[in-house]
Curated annotation (Swiss-Prot):
Bias (Low complexity) ranges: 532-550
Membrane topology according to the record: Multi-pass membrane protein
Stretches the record annotates as Disordered: 1-30, 532-561
Coiled-coil annotated residue ranges, if any: none
Protein name in UniProt: Putative transporter B0361.11
PROSITE patterns referenced in this protein's UniProt entry, alphabetically: MFS (PS50850), SUGAR_TRANSPORT_1 (PS00216)
InterPro entries per the UniProt record, alphabetical: MFS_dom, MFS_sugar_transport-like, MFS_trans_sf, Sugar_transporter_CS
TM regions (residue ranges): 51-71, 148-168, 182-202, 232-252, 263-283, 339-359, 373-393, 399-419, 426-446, 457-477, 486-506
Assigned protein family: Belongs to the major facilitator superfamily. Sugar transporter (TC 2.A.1.1) family.
Length: 578
């Protein structure tokens, strides 16, 4: 008898284990068939956990911004004069003596001050002793080399970001974002102790590679963390964090006159990167498309707890599960449509980065009060970023980019009229920067929504190359001397107008699902309207409410009929009275 009972118990245990395994298998299969966009929307348009993760990654703009703009304050342009036997001789930017041979000191014409006998270069800037250029003996170097701290930063980004983005597509967004953020912080700390300019440039290249990597992958991840409706809010933290990074740089500049201390203090908040490892989750889009069901379960568990909801995901299912795809650069080159998207979006990014950063860097050297000009240039971005929210909700992505590019073109042409007036020139350039800020906020979201999930980070990094070219060119705009002096502004305005034309030829992405792979770009049905899903979701919820009401009414009716007939019970064909 005991043997029989034991065998029954073992049988029950095996049966329950099989049921549990089958349940887990079914659960995993359901997770593999999830639609990524509908999955995110299941937590609502503004789920707490989704907003939290968006804030985490977009805060990184603070550190990127400060890493860029600190260079404007550690190597301000030098005002120099040459002293020769208690006399002052005019010199060029590279310290070449410029005198007429027929006049006094004509024998020194063409010589270099500091090298010619009895000559001495004297820097007249009040705080020149704190300047990186003076510290590394670069006072008389060509302006191309003086700006190389910014240039090498971007060159490092161009080289590294495509490779890091491919790793992000293959191994996930989180490890790349966190690792590069921490490495950028450590390299920034080390750069403030650089013994010479060569070491400083090597570290700046590494910082640029890491900084652009975390920012590029974070931009992609943000669109994957949030629902389509909430993506308009990306610009809030993005612009506020970026502007605060600029203001932080300015505040530190006012704290100390020593360039090394300026650089060190500005870099300190970068310790934030270590916190990301603990708090930042992996992108749900990436987890679903890569069939990482166990990690997705952990994400769901945390999201359910933070959002205080437990979605069923019944309306988020697709007919088939995702095949794990590792689409390569070769697959990208095989798609003409994707190449067109890369070209058009890349050109737009190049132009807006050129305009945006050129104005930002020129505000420090524009004349007048450089602190005030840079402060205006920093703070103007906050209202510009906030304006994006209603604009994106009302107009989508495409029309905002087109109109802002047109107004940016007109502003750049307007600058040429007031080149000799500091106040008017500053105001019109700030108008152009407002337009550039709005485009810079909207266009990365728009471009990200056009690229497939399987190669989204790779595409974003390739688009980053022309963008980086715009950044590389931007600090040199202030050094261009042409006759007439309005030509550079007209040329940039022409590029801006061409960008508006290219934007007109691209498609709107508002209310559209993110394409999952390269093939889905060729099939519109694969990227159908999300608004249809929202309508079906709302209608199903109303139907559900109606069905619940009908069930309650049926229960009421049945209970009333039962109460009336409680004295009669039927068994088969016979009636018995209680």
């Amino acid at each position: 008898m005991s043997i029989s009972r034991r065998s029954y118990e073992q049988f029950d245990e095996m049966k329950s284990e099989n049921q549990e395994n089958n349940s887990k298998k079914k659960s995993s299969e359901r997770l593999k068939k999830l639609d990524p966009d509908k999955f995110v929307e299941a937590y609502g348009a503004y789920g707490k956990y989704q907003i939290f993760t968006y804030v985490l990654v977009q805060t990184l703009n603070f550190f990127y911004s400060s890493s860029m703009y600190i260079m404007s304050f550690v190597q301000l342009n030098l005002e120099k004069q040459c002293e020769y036997k208690n006399e002052t001789i005019p010199i060029s930017e590279t310290c070449q003596i410029e005198t007429e041979s027929s006049k006094a000191f004509g024998n020194l014409n063409g010589e270099y001050c500091g090298i010619a006998e009895n000559t001495l270069v004297n820097v007249t800037n009040q705080k020149a002793s704190t300047n990186l250029l003076v510290d590394f003996d670069l006072s008389c170097s060509h302006w191309f080399f003086q700006e190389f701290g910014l240039t090498i930063f971007t060159i490092g980004a161009v080289i590294a970001v495509p490779f890091m983005s491919m790793l992000a597509d293959r191994y996930g967004r989180k490890p790349i974002i966190v690792t590069t953020a921490i490495l950028a912080f450590l390299a920034n700390m080390a750069a403030s102790f650089s013994p010479n300019f060569a070491i400083f440039l090597i570290l700046r290249a590494f910082i640029g590679a890491c900084s652009d990597s975390y920012l590029s992958v974070a931009s992609v991840a943000t669109c994957e963390y949030l629902s389509e409706k909430a993506r308009a809010w990306i610009t809030v933290v993005y612009n506020v964090a970026w502007s605060l990074g600029m203001v932080w740089t300015l505040l530190v500049t006012l704290m100390t006159d020593d360039w090394r201390w300026r650089y060190f203090i500005v870099s300190l908040p970068g310790v934030y990167g270590f916190a990301l490892w603990y708090f930042l989750p992996e992108s749900p889009h990436w987890l679903i498309t890569k069939n990482k069901t166990e990690k997705l379960k952990k994400y769901i568990k945390t999201a359910n707890r933070v959002n205080n909801v437990s979605p069923e995901f019944n309306d988020c299912q697709q007919s088939s599960h995702h095949e794990e795809k590792h689409e390569s650069f070769k697959a990208l080159l095989g798609s003409k449509k994707l190449i067109w998207l890369l070209f058009a979006n890349g050109f737009i990014e190049m132009v807006i980065s050129l305009v945006y950063f050129a104005i930002s860097f020129m505000s420090v050297e524009l004349g007048g009060d450089q602190v005030q000009a840079f402060l205006y240039s920093s703070l103007i971005e906050i209202p510009a970023g906030l304006a994006v929210i209603p604009l994106m909700m009302k107009m989508g992505r495409k029309m905002i980019v087109i109109w802002c590019l047109v107004f940016q073109t007109l502003a750049l042409i307007g600058v040429t009229v007031f080149l000799d007036s500091y106040e008017f020139k500053l105001v019109i350039m700030l108008v152009a920067k407002v337009m550039a800020t709005i485009i810079y906020s909207v266009h990365p979201i728009w471009a990200t929504e056009q690229f497939p999930t399987s190669v989204r980070s790779l595409c974003f990094s390739l688009m980053n190359i022309p963008q980086s070219m715009g950044i590389i060119m931007s600090p040199y705009v202030k050094h261009i001397v042409m006759s007439p002096n309005w030509i550079p502004f007209v040329v940039i305005a022409l590029f801006s107008f061409i960008s508006a034309t290219l934007a007109f030829m691209l498609h709107e992405t508002k209310n559209k699902k993110l394409p999952t792979d390269i093939e889905s770009l060729s099939y519109p049905s694969e990227t159908n309207d999300l608004s249809a899903y929202r309508r079906s979701k709302s209608s199903s919820s109303s139907v559900s409410a109606l069905s619940k009401t009908s069930v309650r009414s049926k229960k009421t009716l049945s209970s009333e009929s039962v109460s009336k007939k409680l004295d009669t019970v039927n068994f088969s064909d016979k009636e018995y009275r209680i």
